[in-house]
Amino acid sequence: MKNIVFMGTPDYASVILEAILKNGGYNVVAVFTQPDRPVGRKAILTPPEVKKTVLQSGLDIPIFQPLNLKDSSTVNDIKALKPNFIVVAAYGQILPKDILDIAPCINLHASLLPKFRGASPIQEAILRGELLSGVTAMRMGVGLDDGDILGFSVIEIPNLKSSQLFCELAKMAAKLTIKILNEFESISPIAQFHALSSKCGKVHKEDGLIDIKLQTPKIIESKFRAYYPWPGLYLENGVKIWDMEISNLKGENGYVLSIDYDGFTIGVNGGSIKIKSLQESGKKMVNAKDYINGKRLGVGSKFC
């Protein structure tokens, strides 16, 4: 039975880890994940999803949460585990060469490489209006997501939110992981075409801010899907939009153009959007009709 060291942090990685644990053909000798972080207004110390998965499994798998993989003690810990493979999925740290040299390191990246190397490939694919996305399994090198390709899976992504695409790609990545592990010795890796590469950085809260005077309905709708549920889509007045769609009405930016049973429409640059649910800062989410009634807004009223 092959020994695996698994490295990952969010839900996406948990789905992959669960598939390896259920497969029965591999022995997960250790899991590396990010440290517990304070979450929410009360700053409750919360473990990452991968750690939760290990604890809930009831299996006696050592969990490591180092701040830095470059520490010599961490490298020695991994060497002592004698892994046949190191499987990496959205871990959150770059692996140093000392670890890459221990065993084949296989990364499951949530894009069709060489497109969208980096921290936010799912969000970036939606923002760019891509029709296809997918998962790429690669043999990791010292560069950022630039290793040789071992295999990939593809999915059509029109109209998907990032949360939905995360779920779909996680399931695809789980199946691809088992396939690559089973067939690793017979796979001929393919070098990436680096001239076609693109990069994407971490998503920040301010990325969800929209300017209705400058951004078109299509751009706003793409940002809504890309940043759902976090950081979300919000206006300069602090209102967060939880559900929306593009409208075909025309009118003045920021003003209410129409009201119906499931929302209200406001003018934006080059068109309009229909808001169906929203949330004021410090308050609960409400449906748009209740918001309009509570604020006593009507057609022609200024919303933002």
UniProtKB/Swiss-Prot annotation:
Top EC class of this enzyme: transferase
EC id: 2.1.2.9
Keywords assigned by UniProt, alphabetized: Protein biosynthesis, Transferase
Reactions listed under catalytic activity: L-methionyl-tRNA(fMet) + (6R)-10-formyltetrahydrofolate = N-formyl-L-methionyl-tRNA(fMet) + (6S)-5,6,7,8-tetrahydrofolate + H(+)
Protein name: Methionyl-tRNA formyltransferase
Gene Ontology molecular function terms on file: methionyl-tRNA formyltransferase activity
One of the Pfam families matching this protein, by short name: Formyl_trans_N
High-level lineage: Bacteria, Pseudomonadati, Campylobacterota, Epsilonproteobacteria, Campylobacterales
